[in-house]
Amino acid sequence: MTTDSVAAPAHRVLGAGKGCLLIAGGGTGGHVFPALAVAREWLGREPQGARSVVIVGTERGMEAKLVPQAGLPLETIRVAGLKGMGGTKLLKNLAMLPAGFWDSEKIMRRHTFSAAFGVGGYAAGPMILAARLHRVPSVIFEPNVEPGFTNRVLAGISTRVACGFQETATRFGSKAIATGIPVRAEFFAAPRGEHREPFRILITGGSRGALPINRAVIDSLNLLAPRKNQLFIVHQTGERDYNAVRVAYARREFRAEVVPFIENMAERFAQADLIVCRSGAITVAEVAAAGRAAIFIPFGAATDAHQTRNAEAMQNAGAARLLPQTELTPERLTREIFSLLDQPRRITEMEDCARKLARPDAVEDIVNMIEGLVRQ
């Protein structure tokens, strides 16, 4: 936590080479990882100590662990989600709003912020509103094709909007720019695939795994078995399903590496000929950066169907195939895999299309937007 200090009015805008950046939001990795990338870029543009950053989130989101691990200051506010809630849960979360706004106001009084950057999630709403009331210019970041609830609300009061996709920027109008999504440099370093046997498939449902994907793959193994000598599968299962999935591969004598969690995902992307995965904004951006062919299986319950819209954008660009979870059967999954296994040229075409969507300068462009507001 940052110590209290009131050195200047909270709305005073400093020069672009100085000042403290407020980064607000969090909850999931899709919120936190862009926040960390922007924080590092903001701090790294000036000598050490010339700039500072304060990240504001909640005690329950991934930011509570990831931000301190990154060595960055985290402050928290009392706030919870409203969209999709009902009954007593909605009433409880509504009752928390005054506390969240009060916490936000106290943070604004403690610091002299040059600008604010909202990454979506519960904490972004109260903090970006507080920034507006204190006349601190703000940029909000929307990585998905379909904007989230918080960002749809905040777009009207923010100064600028940075978007992961051009069609989203068009939707927000003149204040928006398509910057792309910040992705670690390791993903861009992936070499072009050679697609020689064994055909390497990476399967992942995210760090916690995805039961529907794990179950569909297990049920597909008998159908894949006639060509198992052509395949090598790396499968990230999550902790819950690890043993069941590992045993399923072993019983059928597949060449496979089954792990509960993958530490260096960029390295695994680089080794894969095909990736079977969810289609959250960060994952989609990583697939594009690595230039890999993918079969996207969107999380069906994702808010506003944003994963489906992300996957549709990639499929429409020729960079991926979309397999809706409602259509995820062993037969369909096997058919999609064999179709690409038999068409290495098609995989190469998908890879080329994916690379065209990658935005290696995304984090630089976002910080340029922020600095532009500070200079005004």
Predicted ranges, named:
Residues T3-D4, R359-Q376:
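C-terminal alpha-helical cap of glycosyltransferases
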Residues A16, G49, G61, L66-A70, ...:
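Donor-nucleotide binding loops and adjacent catalytic segments primarily
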Residues K18-G26, G44, G49-A99, E239-D241, ...:
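Conserved nucleotide-sugar phosphate-binding/catalytic loop shared by glycosyltransferases and other
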Residues M62, R132-R192:
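Active-site-proximal region of nucleotide-activated glycan assembly enzymes
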Residues D103-F117, A123-V139, R152-G156:
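Glycosyltransferases and closely related glycan-assembly transferases
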Residues F113-A115, A270-A285, R292-A293:
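Acidic donor-binding loop of glycosyltransferase active sites
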Residues R321-P324, L328-R345:
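C-terminal "capping" alpha-helix adjacent to the active site of nucleotide-linked donor transferases
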Residues R346-P360:
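A short, well-ordered alpha-helix in the C-terminal region of glycosyltransferases
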